[in-house]
Amino acid sequence: MAPNIRKSHPLLKMVNNSLIDLPAPSNISAWWNFGSLLGICLLTQILTGLLLAMHYTADTTLAFSSVAHTCRNVQYGWLIRNLHANGASFFFICIYLHIGRGFYYGSYLYKETWNTGVILLLTLMATAFVGYVLPWGQMSFWGATVITNLFSAIPYIGQTLVEWAWGGFSVDNPTLTRFFALHFLLPFMIAGLTLIHLTFLHESGSNNPLGIVSNCDKIPFHPYFTLKDILGFMLMLLPLTTLALFSPNLLGDPENFTPANPLVTPPHIKPEWYFLFAYAILRSIPNKLGGVLALAASVLVLFLTPFLHKAKQRAMTFRPLSQLLFWILVANLFILTWVGSQPVEHPFIIIGQLASLTYFTILLILFPIIGALENKMLNY
């Protein structure tokens, strides 16, 4: 029989083993589509971002007008920018659902895959933050000022660190230049980390909704999941294009239509919607260093989840108490997101503090306890 180039060629066989002949569990649901959707998001963002970078000028005097020029005078520039800005939102929707899936079905027990995933999330957050500064509108400028200023809470070296990051004594031209450089670089770092993430995943194979070993019942990735993924792409790209074409500014802040002005502070400084939950946790502690630590902990707590798994079963599929707790956590995150968008006044302050406390209590205390309790219930 003639050798199959797909299986013998050094490069093609890597593609083959990852995307074609990969053994996949036969029962993985649509919740397993988000990994490939994140891949499409990354490709779309890099492509649109590259096209935008060709028309962008990273200079405080020109940045705002270069973005306006792109939207007005470049062929389909408005579309490219709208796809890029809203693509970021879809990227975060997909990654949050992807993490939620991993949490629900116990996928975090693949520790290397999970940890590289958390690093990917942190890198994505950094990329989105520096990218938001580039149009150099009011919210870009003040968002950059507020968030970079948080590093000054670090004892002893804080202030030096902030001035080093700024390249001066305030957010100014050097800051914008380096943020553009970082925003160009980080997505390629994300692409590299994604390959590491997939390498670790393919060592163990995918988890499945039952949380049990599925080696006895595997099916090839192609054609089954290639087709299913293409359906997923269509179902994601449809709302993305709808949003970009019909209401591109729905998720943005009107304040960013005003060019950056260091002398005028916007009435409510707030980040894009996908950072609001963390912003609410930051604001809920009336102390700068404490708030910064809580902000960091809100994401870094994900590194601890594999060690807090006390249940004998992997997935929550047959654990109703953990399921209830999981959905309370989801509701709690929605509350945090909403509180983060509100001004700092009564009753939002106390709601934010309670929601922040609940967030950490559920993740660090209640989940392990309920897991252990469910183990006991298995005996009855």
Curated annotation (Swiss-Prot):
Transmembrane portions of the chain: 34-54, 78-99, 114-134, 179-199, 227-247, 289-309, 321-341, 348-368
Pfam families tied to this protein: Cytochrom_B_C, Cytochrome_B
Record-annotated residues binding a ubiquinone? H202
Residue numbers binding heme b b562: H84, H183
> Can you tell which superkingdom this protein's organism belongs to?
Eukaryota
- GO annotations of cellular component type: mitochondrial inner membrane; respiratory chain complex III
Cofactor dependence is on: heme b
Which InterPro entries does the record cross-reference, listed alphabetically?
A: Cyt_b/b6_C, Cyt_b/b6_C_sf, Cyt_b/b6_N, Cytb/b6-like_sf, Cytochrome_b, Cytochrome_b_C_euk/bac, Cytochrome_b_N_euk/bac, Di-haem_cyt_TM
Q: What else is known?
A: Heme 1 (or BL or b562) is low-potential and absorbs at about 562 nm, and heme 2 (or BH or b566) is high-potential and absorbs at about 566 nm.
> Could you tell me what this protein is called?
Cytochrome b
Record the organism: Puffinus nativitatis (Christmas shearwater)
